[in-house]
C-alpha cells in the first residue's frame, strides 16, 4: 500500500530543492514516486498551486489529494477554520475517499503556515530514513499517511446493504397475500434493478483495480531496469507488496460480486 507524503518547507527555494531530492531518491531506487505537486501559502493564508501533478494514471491520486487539500485549506475560510461550504465539503469528501483522515488534513493545515511551501506526493518506500534524511537536511517537515482502500470498503458495504434489501423483499413477497404482492412487486423490481447496477459497479471497480495494479507494476519494472543491485531488491519487495495489496482489495470486491450474482440468479 502506498503512502501520501506532504513535506513542508520554510520557503519556496527549499521546496524546489526538496522536489529535486525526491526525484533523486526515485532514480536511485530508494522509493518510487508516483506523482508530485508543489503548493505555497501566502501571507494572507491563501494556498496556490506552484507546480501541478503530471497527468496520467500514476498521478491521478495525487491530483485528487492536491485539489482536495487546496479546497479545504486554501484560504482563511477552510474547513479547518470552521466553514462548511459545499465546495469545501466536496473537497473533504474527495480526500476521505482516498483514505486520508481529517486529522491528517488538520496536521497539514497547521504545519503549512503563511509563507511556507509544501510538496504533495504519493510514494512507495521500503524505509522512511532516506526520505526523512534528505528532507530534514533542507529543513523540511515530513507528514505521512497511508493511502487506504476506503472506497472499496464503502462499495462493498453499499452492495451488501442493497443485497440484504433485495433478499428481504423477496422473502416478504413470497409470504404476502395477493393484494400485498401487487404493492410489493414494484419495490422488488426496483431492488433487483439496483442490485444489477451494483453488480456492474463492482465489476467495473475490479477491472479498474486490476488495470491500476498493472500500470504500477510496469512502472516499477521500468525503475528496476536502471537500478543498482541493492535497489533492485527493494523494488522487488515493493512489487510483491503491491501485488498482495491489490489481491486483497479485489478479493473483498469479488466476494461481494459473487453474492450479487447468486442473489440475482436465485
Labelled PLM ranges:
Residues 3, 34, 115-117:
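Envelope-exposed proteins and targeting segments
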Amino acid at each position: 500500500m502506498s503512502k501520501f507524503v506532504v513535506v513542508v518547507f520554510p520557503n519556496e527555494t527549499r521546496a524546489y530543492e526538496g522536489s529535486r531530492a525526491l526525484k533523486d531518491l526515485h532514480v536511485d531506487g530508494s522509493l518510487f514516486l508516483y506523482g508530485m505537486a508543489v503548493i505555497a501559502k501566502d501571507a494572507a493564508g491563501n494556498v496556490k498551486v506552484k507546480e501541478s501533478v503530471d497527468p496520467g494514471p500514476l498521478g491521478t491520486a495525487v491530483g485528487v489529494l492536491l485539489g482536495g487539500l487546496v479546497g479545504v485549506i486554501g484560504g482563511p475560510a477552510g474547513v479547518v477554520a470552521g466553514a462548511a461550504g459545499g465546495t469545501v465539503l466536496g473537497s473533504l469528501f474527495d480526500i476521505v475517499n482516498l483514505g486520508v483522515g481529517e486529522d491528517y488534513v488538520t496536521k497539514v493545515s497547521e504545519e503549512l503556515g503563511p509563507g511556507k511551501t509544501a510538496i504533495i506526493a504519493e510514494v512507495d518506500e521500503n524505509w522512511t530514513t532516506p526520505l526523512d534524511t534528505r528532507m530534514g537536511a533542507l529543513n523540511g517537515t515530513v507528514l505521512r499517511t497511508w493511502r487506504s482502500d476506503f472506497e472499496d470498503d464503502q462499495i462493498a458495504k453499499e452492495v451488501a446493504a442493497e443485497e440484504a434489501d433485495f433478499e428481504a423483499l423477496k422473502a416478504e413477497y413470497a409470504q404476502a397475500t395477493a393484494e400485498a404482492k401487487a404493492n410489493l412487486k414494484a419495490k422488488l423490481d426496483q431492488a433487483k434493478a439496483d442490485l444489477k447496477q451494483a453488480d456492474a459497479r463492482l465489476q467495473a471497480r475490479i477491472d479498474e483495480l486490476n488495470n491500476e495494479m498493472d500500470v504500477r507494476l510496469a512502472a516499477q519494472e521500468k525503475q528496476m531496469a536502471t537500478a543498482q543491485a541493492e535497489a533492485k531488491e527493494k523494488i522487488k519487495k515493493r512489487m510483491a507488496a503491491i501485488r498482495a495489496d491489490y489481491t486483497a482489495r479485489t478479493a473483498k470486491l469479488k466476494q461481494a460480486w459473487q453474492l450479487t450474482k447468486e442473489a440475482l440468479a436465485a
